Amino acid sequence: MDKLTPKEASKGAEEILLTQIKQDFITPANAIFDYVDMVEKVLNDADLTSEDEIAQIKSSCNHLIEQYEVAFLQNTGINAETSKKTPEEYSELRHNLRTPLNAIIGYSEILMEDYEDDLEESALEDFQQIINLARETEKAIEVFVDYIRGESIDPNNDTSSNQLESA
């Protein structure tokens, strides 16, 4: 598939593209939960205190998925708002979706640093995987926002046309 804008895509192609955009977000976001559960078990088995940080990561991930679902419903398909948003509204949407990711990354980095001497390498790699998945989710957010802005996106490309640094 070549680069497409929402206006250029046929109805079927648009539905496929939207499914891919959503899947590219949901897959890494859900995988974060699995890795957090694994890390939590390792920390508990090692009698390392981390309940607050783990709870913050889980809460942020839940918040992220909920916000994305609302944004997806409001901005795609028959529910899409017909009026064009301002650049500030797109920036706010991008910011609101990325804020929970920053918490996920930040708390994961804190736990990695706090327990790097107490955990096996595999547990530290799990923390790094959480961070990598958060960055992958961040890229999916960029593609989603670019798409609803009407910008061309390449469904086969992992980066968006408007890639920003982490907020």
Q: Can you say where each PLM-predicted feature lies in the sequence?
A:
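Interdomain "switch/hinge" adjacent to the Bergerat
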Residues: 1-5
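A short, exposed helix-loop element centered on a Lys and neighboring polar residues
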Residues: 69, 142
